[in-house]
């Protein structure tokens, strides 16, 4: 350790892991809301879980948790709680809210759940140049907007199936807090978007339509920027999870 460098704290590292793990509690709170017909509680818990997920990585790097607690896999904790709060809970909420036809609910949700498992375990799920590969299981956001704009059950099913297919399409989607291109603008827009979502959830089920429409700006920005940057990236070596650099004089594999 360099002279004068602060010694990493085991207590702080454990607190960061505990912070990540609160996502499991938030998943239960959200499920409690679904069971008791409180959609706002369910949506609120998913929103808070998203904030936790957006901030715990930076805290973990600052606390140097991999160095201090090498036997505790924070990434695995993150994956468990993300699957609960980004995938399982949103599907539970959408079904309970009548967002899918009863005959189609189980098969459609099964496709979402199973495709998302692959999305979490794929070797190139996160690249070294800070992209997610394949649709990154933003089901919490998808379900919020399907419910917010009262999309029909048939269209809901079509959207869920289409996005499930995109899990397997190796398109890179930006990692909002880490992709360097336009990072400052992305974080500013994401922060403004978060404020709008707080208003929407607080006023649920009747938020002002103007706010609902304005909140679409960031998702549209996210999709457009992801597609533009993906088109500019070099060929991607999925097996190694990094941009593939072909041997001199030889074709890219």
PLM region descriptions:
Residues 4-65:
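Active-site-proximal cofactor/substrate-binding loop regions of enzyme domains
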Residues 58-67, 115-130, 168-177, 224-231:
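C-terminal ends of transmembrane helices
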Residues 1-3, 132-253:
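C-terminal membrane-associated helical module and adjoining short loops/tails
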Residues 29-46, 80, 84, 88-109, ...:
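Helix-coil boundary and interhelical linker segments in multi-pass alpha-helical membrane proteins
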Residues 8-18, 72-80, 125-133, 176-184:
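Short, amphipathic, aromatic/basic-enriched membrane-interface segments that mark the entry/exit
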Residues 16-21, 62-119:
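Multi-pass membrane catalytic core of lipid/isoprenoid biosynthesis enzymes
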């Amino acid at each position: 350790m360099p002279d004068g460098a602060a010694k990493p704290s085991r207590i702080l590292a454990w607190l960061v892991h505990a912070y990540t793990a609160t996502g499991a509690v938030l998943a239960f709170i959200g499920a409690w809301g679904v069971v008791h017909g409180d959609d706002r509680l369910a949506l609120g818990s998913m929103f808070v879980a998203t904030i936790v997920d957006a901030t715990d990585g930076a805290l973990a790097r600052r606390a140097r948790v991999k160095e201090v607690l090498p036997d505790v896999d924070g990434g695995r904790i993150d994956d468990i709680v993300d699957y609960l709060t980004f995938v399982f809970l949103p599907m539970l909420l959408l079904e309970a809210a009548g967002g899918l036809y009863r005959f189609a609910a189980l098969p459609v949700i099964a496709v979402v759940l199973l495709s998302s498992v692959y999305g979490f375990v794929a070797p190139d799920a996160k690249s070294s140049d800070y992209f997610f590969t394949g649709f990154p299981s933003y089901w919490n956001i998808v379900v919020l907007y399907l419910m917010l704009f009262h999309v029909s059950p048939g269209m809901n099913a079509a959207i869920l199936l289409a996005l499930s297919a995109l899990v397997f399409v190796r398109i890179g989607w930006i990692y909002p807090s880490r992709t360097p291109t336009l990072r400052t603008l992305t974080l500013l827009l994401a922060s403004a978007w978060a404020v709008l979502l707080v208003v929407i959830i607080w006023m649920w089920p009747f938020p002002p339509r103007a706010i609902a429409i304005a909140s679409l700006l960031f998702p549209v920005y996210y999709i457009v920027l992801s597609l533009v940057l993906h088109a500019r990236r070099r060929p991607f070596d999925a097996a190694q999870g990094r941009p593939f650099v072909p041997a001199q004089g030889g074709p890219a594999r």
